Curated annotation (Swiss-Prot):
Residues 623-646 have a biased composition (Polar residues). It is found in: Cytoplasm, Cytosol. It is linked to Choroideremia: An X-linked recessive disease characterized by a slowly progressive degeneration of the choroid, photoreceptors, and retinal pigment epithelium. Affected males develop night blindness in their teenage years followed by loss of peripheral vision and complete blindness at middle age. Carrier females are generally asymptomatic but funduscopic examination often shows patchy areas of chorioretinal atrophy. Its main location: cytoplasm. It comes from Homo sapiens (Human). The gene is CHM. Keywords: Cytoplasm, Disease variant, GTPase activation, Sensory transduction, Vision. This is Rab proteins geranylgeranyltransferase component A 1. One of its GO terms (cellular component) is cytosol.
Amino acid sequence: MADTLPSEFDVIVIGTGLPESIIAAACSRSGRRVLHVDSRSYYGGNWASFSFSGLLSWLKEYQENSDIVSDSPVWQDQILENEEAIALSRKDKTIQHVEVFCYASQDLHEDVEEAGALQKNHALVTSANSTEAADSAFLPTEDESLSTMSCEMLTEQTPSSDPENALEVNGAEVTGEKENHCDDKTCVPSTSAEDMSENVPIAEDTTEQPKKNRITYSQIIKEGRRFNIDLVSKLLYSRGLLIDLLIKSNVSRYAEFKNITRILAFREGRVEQVPCSRADVFNSKQLTMVEKRMLMKFLTFCMEYEKYPDEYKGYEEITFYEYLKTQKLTPNLQYIVMHSIAMTSETASSTIDGLKATKNFLHCLGRYGNTPFLFPLYGQGELPQCFCRMCAVFGGIYCLRHSVQCLVVDKESRKCKAIIDQFGQRIISEHFLVEDSYFPENMCSRVQYRQISRAVLITDRSVLKTDSDQQISILTVPAEEPGTFAVRVIELCSSTMTCMKGTYLVHLTCTSSKTAREDLESVVQKLFVPYTEMEIENEQVEKPRILWALYFNMRDSSDISRSCYNDLPSNVYVCSGPDCGLGNDNAVKQAETLFQEICPNEDFCPPPPNPEDIILDGDSLQPEASESSAIPEANSETFKESTNLGNLEESSE
């Protein structure tokens, strides 16, 4: 495959995370020749989403990754006298302390297959009692005896769309498209609902159903392609930088979104819904009439707090938590503002930080729905793929499973000249963007990383029952003691195309102080109970039951300055992995900053040209983007219940 690649590009991007994908799209849109490579077999890096079997394969890859022994660098012969090489790392050390627990009944048989699976490695199919299964499913831990796990591995990592789970709104049934991960060195393909219907037979939903409330592990395996499990758990602020970029660049046409329907609070051992809009506040039965007036008055002030500096003068240096106590708010209102609206730390957030966060929350209300947040159908892993698709449309070349052995640096200028790939091909470029996980240890010896604690749960019911079982919720559980951090809980229903019917996908996230399980297990125990056969028929069980759980720590390199990396060439730019924040603003800011260094004074991801405005002048095309091209046209196949950013933007403004 190497001889088919051109030998020279303007920009080479290594890694397909969200920041790298945005930069690749922006550079390609600006006319640069872009090569975008990743040694992984899937798009997104630590921003990726996986089907259930794909996630198990990912876990196995990380176990095998820890056993990699560096080979003798055969590319050294290609390094000239006036050059030196920076060997890139083959080990990804961004994920640690992985632990998997399976609570669902493990009546797994060898003939159970994932619906729509294209290829299976039978050597990796194991029985429920096999200790080999646990070893292949997660990295060894000190407490392996607590984790029983059986798994069916597939060599494919491809999540799929589900035309059967068509969304319904006002009686109208509609379907949409799902963009698949690539398994080879090709550009991002899209798969239509009609194509996917061949892989996921409609008859699957009408076959034998398990008895009420009983979900087995084999059923999760069989329905594994209905899961799209994110490695990083985030939401999109409706007026955040990423939404604005999606609309501006017209990349929004490649994705669909759903509104977060509920904001929840956990108080005195109970989960309750929090009012956040004006209508919610005045319709709330949780607040007294006096509290409603107090809350609306305070929120009105927060919307324009910069105009009234006297209101917070002298309080700038204290925490937002202490400031709220001075505002004559009841403890109930203080809790709601602190943990469900501002969503800031009681100990680490200043008054100004809290006021900014509250204003941002209120500013995003009402643009697309009753809450400030959106979630992409099929998971966060769709977003990097959307920008990769834009890059490919404008000529970018994509190669997955394509390792870069080293960066070639000129000794005199201290600039990077080229890369040498796994086939020994030298590829020249002017600019290089590298995801930080590819850098060797000697280059990162002065870097101090933070960690993110993550948990992913598959449960059988929502944390707060309502008439509808299709709720998407966010809940913040405050820190219990000094030195720990608040835990963010995002619960996704099956209409988000991230889990099978009858289940919920729950993501827990916090800044790490210990291992992920140590940080998050206490919150899990407050909200959920393990699934056991004895409780299946017990209708008095109030908490959701955990069918399957995954804990892991992920590196957070978002605040690392490039000066912390040793001997970094001036034309090599570092892209960090996900941060612990709820939104994606950090990734967008990083991408725009690096783009301006590569392409100064050029527009960042401008709208694509309207085909009607393209003027043919000799052999050159001179696209002129009309105003209307910045807002996507309605698609006849788009989800009506989900959010089309362009359409709603058009109607709301």
